[in-house]
C-alpha cells in the first residue's frame, strides 16, 4: 500500500460524450479543437506561444491515443513519438450535467443520480421569493444582474454600479450555480462570504449545486478584474466519497485548490488553496513529497485555470499555452513518485474554447495513469468517472465501492 496523486485538469475534455447532442454540444472537443486550431496558426499569440500544440509528455502518457479512442481522430501533434509510458483510456460521465461538482463527485465514487436545479435563461432568472429572501436576510439594498451571464462580461457591465449602490451582482449560467460578484474592497470579502452563506441555505430547496463568491477589484476607468479569492459554497455529497472512506480509515488526505469547496469541506483533510495552476501544482507536489503523507495517503488537486481563465473566455492561445506549461512539468511529477506510488491525470468536463457561448461542454475525459512499476497500455472506455475512484481505492487498499478498477 502506497500513496496516490490525483490531478484534475479542469475542463480538459477530449471529445463529445455519447449524449452531447442533448446538451447542445455535439461535436465539441476541447483538446482536439485546440490542437487543430494551433496546427493552422489560430493558436498563435505574440509573446505567448506559436505553432502546433506541443505536449510531448502528455502524448507519451497516452493523451492523444485516449482522444483518438474517444472521437476516432488523433489530434494534430498528439501521437506519441515513441513508446507509451502510461496506462491510458477515456471515461464517460453517468451523471446528468456538465458541471464541476458532478464531475468531481463521480470521480470520487459518487455519481449524481438526480437532476440538479437550474435557473432559466430569462430576465429575471431567479424566483422572486428567492431574491426577496436574500435581500432581507443578508441585509442588502437590492441586487443587480438576475440573469444568465459571463462572469467577466457582467462585472465590466455592472461593476461600477455595484460599487456605487452596494448591490451585489447575482447571475447564473446553464450550470447549477448561483454566483455573487462584488468589489473586494468596497463591498468586502467577509461580507461577500456572509451573503453567499445565506444564499447557500436559501438555494438548498432548489437543488442548486454551488453558490460561488466572485470578488473583483478595479474601477470604471481601468476596468474590473476578478481576483483569486473565489470561494465555492457547495452542497455536500449525498453519500460517502473516496475522501470519506480514506478519512474513516485514518488515511492522510491533502486537498489542493478548490477541492475543499467542491466537497463542502467534508473529509478533505489538510486544505491548501493557492492561486493559479502553477501554485496549485507546486503545493500538490510539495504535499506529496512531505514525509507526513504516509502509506495510503492521497493528494487531490484541481487545476482550475484551464476552465476559468481560458475555457469560459474562449481563449485558444491561452488554453494551449497553459496545456504546454503543464506538460513541461510531467517529468517533475514523475520524479516525485516513489516505488508503489500512483498518479492519475483526468478532467471533470469539457470547455471547448472554440465552441459557441461561454459555458462548459459535455465531453468525455482522459484517464492517464502512471507510476513506478505500473504497466503501460490501453484502459479502454470507462463507462463512469467512478472507475477512477475505484482504481484509487484499490491502490490505497480500500474495499471496492462504486465503479470498476483497472488495477
From Swiss-Prot:
One of the Pfam families matching this protein, by short name: Metalloenzyme
Name recorded for this polypeptide: Phosphopentomutase
Principal subcellular localisation of the protein: cytoplasm
Top-rank taxon: Bacteria
An annotated GO cellular component: cytosol
Protein's GO biological process: 2-deoxyribose 1-phosphate catabolic process; 5-phosphoribose 1-diphosphate biosynthetic process; metabolic compound salvage; nucleotide metabolic process
Pathway entry: Carbohydrate degradation; 2-deoxy-D-ribose 1-phosphate degradation; D-glyceraldehyde 3-phosphate and acetaldehyde from 2-deoxy-alpha-D-ribose 1-phosphate: step 1/2
Organism for this UniProt entry: Methylobacterium nodulans (strain LMG 21967 / CNCM I-2342 / ORS 2060)
Residues annotated to bind Mn(2+) 1: 10, 348-349
Co-factor(s): Mn(2+)
Keywords for this protein: Cytoplasm, Isomerase, Manganese, Metal-binding
Gene: deoB
